[in-house]
């Protein structure tokens, strides 16, 4: 924020680099919270929802591969901490959840309508966007 002194910001950046962080970016608190909602909190929401959507009592563990393991690794979380983080960034988190839901529904609709062309368009779009990261 404008209250921070330049010398203090440089000191924090130096410490972060010394700790091994490679990408340090100065940003506003508002933009930080928007990005954290999308890049950290939404993936945790998805991991919890995916894990909890399984039918209890099945031997799912005998069938999982790397995709499931990768997506659900972060579902093993500190419930007290993450509850506070989600609620503390509620407005931003709900916005990204709504955007995700819209994309999810588009994929679902394409499957329901046997729209192979639309599915492929969505896959191509995501591949191109992922390559830019």
What are these regions (language model features)?
Residues 1-74:
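Internal alpha-helical scaffold of NAD(P)-dependent oxidoreductase catalytic cores
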Residues 59-129:
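Interdomain hinge/lid region at the active-site interface
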Residues 132-133:
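Amphipathic alpha-helical coiled-coil segments
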